[in-house]
């Protein structure tokens, strides 16, 4: 017996109608835009947002992406690199209570390391390390619960990465068990969605069994295959099934559980989310996006190739609603879309190809509204469309079989006006004037060929005075009026008008002021006409007044639009020369420029709200004048406008205060009271640090970074690393392209560098020292984050300029000086010794010379007496005739021998 029969629950079968309405709910007009062009076209299996505000997108085949509102960063499996994902097939992404990011893949589990921007692969066991992880949860002990397809359920202690097997009591064939989702209820119950039904985890026993729910009759279990689970703060549990729609489990006032089955689809509900209003968003396989509000009303969004703002595919694998109510949807093969309510402040009415219930064509030239609340919309090349916002229907008056009015035969409509009697006036570019009187079904056409008064078929502008007379401005034939009482048309071409060429002016815009004066804006300036019907009307040309003003910038007085505000000032919009305000009494002219944050060159239309706010449209979007700050607040396509270029005098203020502006792509409309300032400024994160244009990778050899730069408080750089670039971004997903930045290097600069939308800062040749790099951002509404992001930077002095090096240099210098001193001293001593030795040697040589001379002299002195001795002795000894006594002869011989010996010694001495 089925669950819904057991508990008398209500089965709701819905036939989806594409134009089903939720009153004024934002769900009526969900407009989805891709987050980026380069996001994966693989199945988007998971989308989450971490505590820092970074989005993480899991894909089946392209790994995981991080997204910060500006750019995507892709993490994939890389063969041989264990710091990457173990598989690019990502099935689920989970953020635990400590902001740790876990990624379940076809090959197991991964933990993201923020400090190093890399992954750790978690191994379950040695025998079965390849597990197809499909769901991740967390229990009260901060342990992870991991559900797989075909490998069972595991519990992981994140403190030591110890893995335990969870016993599954509900099913004994683990190889066929498929865990699809894990969610925790507000009461702490942990539920598992699986192919065998809804299971509940028992943390005390570490086991899994069927979840039992107490009802009025008996405990019941759900054995339908469950694809997704949503637990809400109100205690209700929502289950997305495989083919039986949506199941709601709620607690009754008697604390019994009640079941309700919503058969909203027979396709797989792959993802469930809820918004702040309690609406349930269901992402389905091949059945689009289905939303169930808290009243039980269902709206279905399906792919429509003619709807550029609709969903891109009927196969939606993931839905995520962030803390700022943005809706993110991930497709099977179309990437990721986002709906941002903040971008929908400006709504639009557009021409959609092949859709009859849209504008006939794009370029809207005029907008007005009748008493029935219907909008009459003038269209270039499209005639007039009548739009009924209550019925959301368009009636194209060019179609002669329409039920509102026939006879409009011109497609080139310039202006549409509804007077106080509810007569409708249509001015065309080439077919004159069309008048549809109240209660009539056929337009009356007034043009040159059937009127003796009308001289131009180009009708540019209408206005009504307090007497009910209609004033008409034409192209090149000036001013006309139409008296509704008499039904007569009048052309103003008297001498006074001719003298100022009013009768041949190209009137672009005319208004009637509070005194019934007529103001006309032409291609040759501004004119005020008082008492226009008198014989001598007073016509004041303001061209000379404007041209003679000290601030005048008009070249040719090319006016495009004028209005009178509640203070009776005349606001003047020009083609190419900007905006000015005229005080008709003092004739004071006030021009607006960049000093008031005014950045339009051409003003196409101006309008004032009931609260007195001035809004204008031009060639650069829409602007509001803030009278308190005396400056303009500007809005463009980044804020949700369909274009920045608007048509002349195509605007309207409805009775309920809604502003409408016509442009070349349709109509933008909005409630000015809803255009509030975003009070949250962007937080700035650092994304890269480059030295000499090369990105620095943490923990690489020689890298000054130990962590990624955004996780680094201070970085220390060498003296040769003083040319660096810091990349940054301001976190934001609403109009992120409008975020602007300012930075400065404290200690090197004294003031902020305001760099508009540039997201990097480069410094070169920074001297050694301690610095703080500071960067802040401002959101699109001008709110600055006054708490800048700071990175400390220390640039080291060259090693040869350090104190230790200087001390070493000093000691080395002193040592060298000492060595040189010692060396010189030794050399000096040696030189002195040599000198002394030389002097001693010279003295010795001189002494020797004197001695030799002395010896020589003595030798000569000795030789002569000796010779005188030897000669007699030789004669005595040689005289044989004289016989001497033997003793005397012997003594003579001794004397002779010694004398001879002495003579030889003297000869030797002489020879020396």
Question: Model regions: which residues?
Answer:
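Residue-level detector of Asp-centered blade-edge/turn motifs that repeat once per structural unit
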Residues: 49-52, 95-98, 138-141, 184-187, ...
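Short loop/turn segments that connect beta-strands within beta-propeller blades
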Residues: 68-71, 113-117, 157-161, 202-206, ...
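Hydrophobic anchor positions in the alpha-helical DHp
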Residues: 667, 909-912
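Short alpha-helical segment of the dimerization/phosphotransfer core of two-component systems
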Residues: 894-902
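Conserved beta-propeller blade signature
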Residues: 55-56, 100-102, 143-145, 189-192, ...
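Primarily the dimerization/phosphotransfer
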Residues: 830-881, 897, 911
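Residue-level "micro-hotspots" composed of small/polar
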Residues: 23-49, 79-89, 129, 175, ...
């Amino acid at each position: 017996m089925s669950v819904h029969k057991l508990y008398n629950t209500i089965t709701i079968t819905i036939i989806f109608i594409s134009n089903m309405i939720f009153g004024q709910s934002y769900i009526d007009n969900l407009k989805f835009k891709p987050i980026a062009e380069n996001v994966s076209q693989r199945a988007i299996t998971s989308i989450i947002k971490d505590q820092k505000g970074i989005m993480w997108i899991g894909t089946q085949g392209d790994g995981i992406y991080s997204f910060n509102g500006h750019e995507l960063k892709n993490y994939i499996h890389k063969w041989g690199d264990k710091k990457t994902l173990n598989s690019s097939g990502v099935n689920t992404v989970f953020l635990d209570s400590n902001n740790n990011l876990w990624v379940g893949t076809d090959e197991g589990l991964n933990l993201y390391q923020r400090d190093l921007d890399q992954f750790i692969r978690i191994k379950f066991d040695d025998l079965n390390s390849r597990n197809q992880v499909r769901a991740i949860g967390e229990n009260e002990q901060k342990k992870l619960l991991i559900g797989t397809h075909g490998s069972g359920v595991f519990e992981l202690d994140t403190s030591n990465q110890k893995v335990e097997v969870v016993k599954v009591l509900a099913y004994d064939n683990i190889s066929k068990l498929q865990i699809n989702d894990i969610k925790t209820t507000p009461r702490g119950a942990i539920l598992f969605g699986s192919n065998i039904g809804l299971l509940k985890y028992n943390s005390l026993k570490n086991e899994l069994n069927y979840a039992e729910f107490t009802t009025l009759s008996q405990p019941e279990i759900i054995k339908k295959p469950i694809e997704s689970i949503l637990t809400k703060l109100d205690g209700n549990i929502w289950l997305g099934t495989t083919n039986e729609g949506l199941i709601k489990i709620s607690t009754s006032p008697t604390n019994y559980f009640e079941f309700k089955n919503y058969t909203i689809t027979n396709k797989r509900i792959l993802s469930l989310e809820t918004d702040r209003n309690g609406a349930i968003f269901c992402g389905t396989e091949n059945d689009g996006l289905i939303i169930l509000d808290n009243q039980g009303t269902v709206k279905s969004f399906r792919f429509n190739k003619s709807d550029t703002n609709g969903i891109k595919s009927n196969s939606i694998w993931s839905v995520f609603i962030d803390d700022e109510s943005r809706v993110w949807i991930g497709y099977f093969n179309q990437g990721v879309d986002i709906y941002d309510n903040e971008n929908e402040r400006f709504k639009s009415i557009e021409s959609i190809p092949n859709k009859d219930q849209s504008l006939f064509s794009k370029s809207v030239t005029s907008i007005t509204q009748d008493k029935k609340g219907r909008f009459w919309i003038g269209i270039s090349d499209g005639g007039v469309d009548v739009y009924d916002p209550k019925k959301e229907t368009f009636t194209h008056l060019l179609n002669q079989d329409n039920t509102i009015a026939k006879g409009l035969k011109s497609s080139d409509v310039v202006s549409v006006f509804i007077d106080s009697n509810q007569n409708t006036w249509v001015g065309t570019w080439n077919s004159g004037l069309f008048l549809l009187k109240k209660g009539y079904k056929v337009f009356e056409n007034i043009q040159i060929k059937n009127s003796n008064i009308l001289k131009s078929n180009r009708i540019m502008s209408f206005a009504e005075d307090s007497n009910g007379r209609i004033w008409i401005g034409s192209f090149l034939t000036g001013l006309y009026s139409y008296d509704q009482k008499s039904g007569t048309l009048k052309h103003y071409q008297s001498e006074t008008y001719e003298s100022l060429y009013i009768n041949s002016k190209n009137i672009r815009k005319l208004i009637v002021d509070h005194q019934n004066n007529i103001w006309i804006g032409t291609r040759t300036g501004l004119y005020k006409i008082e008492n226009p019907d008198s014989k001598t009307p007073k016509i004041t040309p303001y061209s000379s007044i404007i041209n003679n003003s000290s601030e005048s910038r008009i070249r040719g007085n090319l006016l495009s639009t004028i209005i009178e505000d509640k203070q009776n000032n005349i606001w003047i919009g020009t083609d190419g020369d900007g905006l000015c305000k005229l005080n008709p009494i003092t004739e004071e002219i006030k021009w607006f420029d960049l000093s008031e944050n005014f950045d339009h060159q051409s003003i196409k239309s101006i309008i004032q709200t009931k609260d007195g706010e001035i809004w204008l449209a031009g060639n650069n979007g829409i602007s509001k004048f803030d009278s308190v700050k005396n400056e303009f607040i500007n809005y463009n396509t980044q804020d949700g406008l369909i274009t920045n270029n608007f048509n002349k005098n195509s605007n309207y203020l409805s009775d309920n205060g809604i502003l409408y502006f016509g442009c070349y792509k349709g109509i933008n409309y909005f409630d000015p009271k809803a255009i509030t300032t975003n009070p949250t400024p962007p937080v700035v994160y650092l994304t890269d640090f480059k030295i000499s244009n090369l990105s620095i990778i943490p923990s690489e050899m020689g890298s000054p970074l130990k962590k990624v730069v955004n996780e680094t408080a201070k970085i220390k750089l060498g003296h040769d690393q003083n040319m660096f670039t810091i990349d940054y971004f301001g976190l934001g997903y609403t109009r992120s392209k409008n975020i602007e930045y300012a930075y400065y290097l404290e200690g090197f600069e004294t003031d902020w560098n305001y760099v508009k939308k540039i997201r990097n800062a480069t410094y070169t040749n920074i001297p050694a020292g301690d610095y703080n790099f500071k960067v802040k951002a401002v959101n699109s509404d001008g709110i600055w984050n006054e708490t800048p992001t700071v990175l400390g930077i220390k640039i080291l002095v060259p090693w040869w300029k350090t104190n230790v090096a200087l001390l070493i240099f000093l000691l080395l210098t002193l040592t060298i000086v000492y060595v040189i001193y010692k060396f010189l001293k030794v050399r000096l001593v040696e030189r002195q010794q040599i000198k002394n030795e030389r002097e001693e040697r010279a003295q010795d040589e001189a002494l020797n010379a004197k001695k030799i001379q002395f010896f020589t002299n003595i030798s000569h002195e000795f030789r002569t007496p000796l010779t005188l001795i030897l000669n007699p002795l030789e004669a005595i000894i040689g005289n044989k005739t004289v016989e001497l006594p033997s003793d005397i002869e012997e003594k003579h011989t001794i004397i002779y021998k010694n004398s001879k010996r002495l003579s030889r010694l003297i000869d030797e001495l002489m020879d020396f």
